[in-house]
């Protein structure tokens, strides 16, 4: 189990990657307590003084001008949670819910939400007990925050809704009992504070970021293997080429290929005097394409790290000034655009991989046996595996369409522009799965090509990468049932086994 002390506003991407991967034991920095208490006191003072403040003693959305009587304030907070729990579809994975809850705890604990520490402590206890609310994946437009997903999370605090514990769906009441909790009666503003925020969108986008980083590392390894298998040149990775263009990420991408390929190898020396002048773009322009993808990954990482530590509630309590101010931090446009950029990177990583794989099976370009198998005609080799890769690459082109440019008014036109950040982040999982499948096919093909170059060998790192695959998948001496081999290669990549072959500091959370 991963242990994490939350210092509000200070979560790192590396910590969040661990939260997304492992059950987590949370604790909260005790220095956060005073700010939370003061913030909650400001809300209590509003009630005591009889002021009218949105979200505390008013309705919500288009009903914001409706004043709520003091006797109904507890009912108001309970009602907003139950009425907004209107999601649909399959439940989020436990890992996504855990990440979302950690983000919510981090935001609330900063002391701008007017919520009592006991509510935050209850969320922490649920995470520590590995009790995860059942949250439908669909139903949020990413403004006013992720209302439906966060409402489903919050129903469990009331002893309502459903949760999952050790793979079993249980009632909210049972979930609280397992976590050693009793149902909470929410104080004024607490229901709205729980529901307003970008944490579902950000959790999906962070998962997409972590997947994109893993894919980037895998694709760089596969690309370097393909260079060797196709008797490609190392010259396109010369640092001087990339230095004069000036893009930092392109320079770093080229460095990663040099790191893998080393100065030379038996295979490299075997074609020193060949007649080929230039390699096809899918080999030669890898630093340029992958460098651009790396830049999008890094840009998105910066945005998502800020958002992960942000306060996206509304209204916000500024206790030092005694002010409660309504704004729009719940609007997840930054998250949506970051996710859209990740979608571009994930799609292009897969698209370039498919082209390299297509090159390998083309004997005219690669100087390898047609479709990477002997006795062609009797054997079809990798012929249809490339078709599968092409299908996945084309599917990703559709999924990469920007979600952030879409908007549909909600709440009787009070919420008349929305971000669609939740979908923007959620579809990244499907895209990553597609790209991983493409890379799995290339990995199989590149390893096959390298074996055809025997007895010549590649660099130590490339040989190690091939060895990891060969522990699970044998060389193709003739046609056999292909799908299980793709599945094994896919599983290897899903384990992110090639991340450690990357230079340090290349990828933000690794």
UniProtKB/Swiss-Prot annotation:
Protein name as catalogued: Histidine ammonia-lyase
Organism domain of life: Bacteria
UniProt-listed GO biological process terms: L-histidine catabolic process to glutamate and formamide; L-histidine catabolic process to glutamate and formate
InterPro entries xrefs: Aromatic_Lyase (IPR001106), Fumarase/histidase_N (IPR024083), HutH (IPR005921), L-Aspartase-like (IPR008948), Phe/His_NH3-lyase_AS (IPR022313)
Catalytic activity, EC: 4.3.1.3
Entry coiled-coil feature ranges: none
Keywords for the protein's UniProt record, in alphabetical order: Cytoplasm, Histidine metabolism, Lyase
Family: Belongs to the PAL/histidase family.
Cross-link 5-imidazolinone (Ala-Gly): where in chain: 143-145
Signal peptide: none
Post-translational modification: Contains an active site 4-methylidene-imidazol-5-one (MIO), which is formed autocatalytically by cyclization and dehydration of residues Ala-Ser-Gly.
Organism: Aliivibrio fischeri (strain ATCC 700601 / ES114)
Pathway(s) served: Amino-acid degradation; L-histidine degradation into L-glutamate; N-formimidoyl-L-glutamate from L-histidine: step 1/3
UniProt xrefs under Pfam families: Lyase_aromatic
Gene name of the record: hutH
GO molecular function list: histidine ammonia-lyase activity
Cysteine pairings via disulfide bonds: none
Entry's localization field: Cytoplasm
Matches recorded under NCBIfam families: hutH, PRK09367.1
2,3-didehydroalanine (Ser) carried by residues: 144
Lineage: Bacteria, Pseudomonadati, Pseudomonadota, Gammaproteobacteria, Vibrionales
Catalytic reaction equation(s): L-histidine = trans-urocanate + NH4(+)
